[in-house]
Regions:
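Juxtamembrane low-complexity tails/linkers enriched in Ser/Thr-Pro and polybasic
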Residues: 1-5
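Periplasmic c-type cytochrome electron-transfer domains
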Residues: 7-488
C-alpha cells in the first residue's frame, strides 16, 4: 500500500515538474520569441511612415533599450537632443520618430522602414517647426551615423544590464520576470547583435562616409545578404524621392536604372534594410489580398508611392519670369527631363560625365549572387542586371531634391547651372532651412556646420563633375530657368 502511494506521489511530482517546465518554456517563449501581428495603420501614409517592412526580426532593437541609449550615451551623439541630432523626425508626439517601426517579437523591437530614408524636412526660417514631406529624400537624416551610434554604445563598457535597467526604471516599470529576462538574456543578446552588426558593416569603413541624406542601398545586399567578397567599389548615392513612381517605372527606379517594377524596387529596398527571407515569403504570399488589415505590408507601400505627388514650392514664384524659363527649359532640358517623364530613359555615364562609382558598385557577379540567394522565391526581383547609364529622372518636386546629381554633390540648382570648376568643392549636408533664391538647402554657416556633415567633392564617389547642360546660358536665362523649375 505504501509502495503504491509512494509511486503515485512520484508520478504526481513528475507530472507537476513537467507541467511547470512546460509553463516556464511557454512563458519564456511568449516573452522572448512569440511574434504578434504588426500594428495596423488606417491610412497608407501612416503605414508608410510607421509600418513594418519586416526588419524587426533581423535588425530590431528592444524598444526600451533603444529609448534609453541616448540618455546613457549622450557623448556618443553629435550634440544634445537625442536621436533628433541624427536627423530623425518627430510627428504628432508619437513614441517613435518617422521611419522607425515597432513589432513585438517576444518584446517590442524597433527597426527601420522605408520612411527612414524617404521622408524629408524643410523649414523657411531657423525658428520654424519642420514640415515633414513623406516620399521626399531624407536629406536631413544621417543613416550611417545612426548605425554607428548604436554600435558605439554596444562597444562601450557602460553598456551593462545595471545601467540600462536603471535608466529604463526611470521611464517604465518592467515586471520582475521581465527584469530578469532583460538582465540575463535581452540586454546581453542586444549587445551581441549590435557587435555583429559592427562586424557585418565593416565594409563601410573602407569607403568615404555617406554623410546626411545618402546611403549605399546595394552595399548591405552585396556584402551582408548575398555574401559577395568585400571590394573597394563605392555605391554611396543620394536618397531618392518616391513620388510619381508609376511615371518613372518604365525607365528604371534606382539611379542606375535597376528595376522597372515598383514591387521589385520595394522588395529590394526592404531586403537592404534588413527584412528577413521568411518575412518576405509571408508578406508576398498576401500580395493579392485586398482587405486592408490582411494586405501585404509592402503592397501598401507600393500603393502609396505609385501616384504620390510632391508638395508645391512653398515660396513666391515670379510668374512672368517662370514663363520665360519655360522656353529655356524646352530648349535646354526637355529632351531628357520632359515634364511628363516620357524622355527619362537615361544617359550613359560617358555622355553625362558624372561620377561613375555608383554604376561600378553593382556587378554581374553581384547579380548572380542575388539570384542564388533569392532562388525560386516569389519575391525574387528582376531587372538587376548592371548597366552603363544613369536615369534622367523626372523633375517633379525638384526644389526639395537638393543636393543634386545622383551622389548629391551639388548643393543647389543655381550651382548646378555653373561649370563644375565653379561649383562648391566643399559644403555641408543635412541642414533643412531652405534657400528659395538658389533653390536648395542652406549649405554653409554656423548652423549648417553644427547640424550637418561635410561633403568633400574631392573624395572618391563624391565628385561634382558632369551634367554641364545649361552652364553656358546667359545669366538672365539661368535666372528664368531656375524660376520655372520652382513650378515642378
Amino acid at each position: 500500500m505504501r509502495t503504491r502511494a509512494a509511486a503515485l506521489r512520484k508520478r504526481w511530482m513528475v507530472a507537476v515538474v513537467i507541467v511547470l517546465g512546460v509553463f516556464a518554456m511557454l512563458t519564456v517563449y511568449n516573452r522572448l520569441f512569440r511574434e504578434r501581428p504588426a500594428p495596423y495603420f488606417e491610412s497608407d501614409e501612416e503605414h508608410f511612415l510607421y509600418g513594418s517592412v519586416g526588419t524587426e526580426s533581423n535588425e530590431g532593437i528592444p524598444y526600451w533599450i533603444w529609448l534609453v541609449l541616448p540618455r546613457i550615451f549622450p557623448d556618443l551623439l553629435p550634440g544634445p537632443g537625442g536621436y533628433t541630432t541624427l536627423g530623425l523626425l518627430s510627428k504628432d508626439a508619437r513614441d517613435l520618430p518617422v521611419g522607425l517601426s515597432t513589432v513585438t517579437i517576444g518584446y517590442p523591437r524597433v527597426a527601420m522602414n522605408c520612411a527612414f530614408c524617404h521622408a524629408g524636412s524643410v523649414r523657411a526660417q531657423p525658428g520654424d517647426l519642420p514640415t515633414i514631406v513623406p516620399g521626399a529624400p531624407a536629406h536631413q537624416v544621417a543613416a550611417q551615423r545612426y548605425n554607428r551610434f548604436l554600435i558605439a554604445a554596444a562597444s562601450d563598457p557602460r553598456f551593462t544590464a545595471g545601467n540600462i535597467l536603471g535608466e529604463i526604471a526611470r521611464n517604465y516599470r518592467l515586471s520582475a520576470l521581465d527584469r530578469l529576462l532583460y538582465r540575463f538574456v535581452v540586454i546581453p543578446g542586444t549587445r551581441q547583435r549590435l557587435l555583429r552588426l559592427k562586424e557585418q558593416g565593416g565594409w563601410m569603413d573602407r569607403r568615404p562616409d555617406w554623410g546626411h541624406g545618402r546611403a549605399d542601398v546595394f552595399g548591405p545586399i552585396r556584402f551582408q545578404r548575398v555574401g559577395r567578397p568585400i571590394d573597394d567599389a563605392i555605391g554611396s548615392a543620394d536618397m531618392m524621392p518616391l513620388w510619381s513612381m508609376a511615371q518613372r517605372e518604365p525607365q528604371g527606379l534606382f539611379w542606375n536604372g535597376l528595376h522597372t517594377s515598383i514591387r521589385d524596387a520595394v522588395v529590394t529596398s526592404a531586403l537592404s534594410a534588413g527584412a528577413s527571407r521568411p518575412w518576405l515569403d509571408a508578406d508576398i504570399a498576401k500580395w493579392d489580398r485586398t482587405d486592408a488589415q490582411g494586405m501585404s505590408s509592402l503592397r501598401r507601400v507600393e500603393r502609396y508611392i505609385t501616384d504620390l505627388k510632391p508638395p508645391p514650392f512653398p515660396f513666391p514664384v515670379d510668374a512672368g519670369l517662370a514663363a520665360a524659363g519655360e522656353t529655356v527649359f524646352a530648349a535646354e532640358c526637355a529632351q531628357c527631363h520632359s515634364r511628363d517623364g516620357a524622355s527619362a530613359a537615361g544617359l550613359s555615364a560617358g555622355v553625362v560625365d558624372t561620377d561613375r562609382h555608383r554604376l561600378s558598385s553593382w556587378t554581374t557577379d553581384a547579380s548572380k549572387a542575388y539570384d542564388a540567394f533569392a532562388g525560386r522565391r516569389a519575391w525574387k526581383a528582376s531587372g538587376l542586371e548592371p548597366g552603363e547609364r544613369y536615369v534622367s529622372v523626372p523633375l517633379d518636386g525638384v526644389w526639395i531634391r537638393a543636393p543634386y546629381l545622383h551622389n548629391g554633390s551639388v548643393p543647389s540648382l543655381k550651382d548646378l547651372l555653373e561649370v563644375p570648376t565653379n561649383r562648391p568643392a566643399r559644403f555641408w549636408r543635412g541642414y533643412d532651412v531652405y534657400d528659395p533664391v538658389n533653390v536648395g538647402f542652406l549649405s554653409d554657416g554656423p548652423e549648417a556646420r553644427r547640424t550637418g556633415t561635410l561633403h568633400d567633392t574631392r573624395q572618391s564617389g563624391n565628385a561634382n563633375v558632369g551634367h554641364d547642360y545649361g552652364t553656358a546660358l546667359p545669366a538672365e536665362s539661368k535666372r528664368a530657368l531656375l524660376e520655372y523649375l520652382k513650378t515642378f
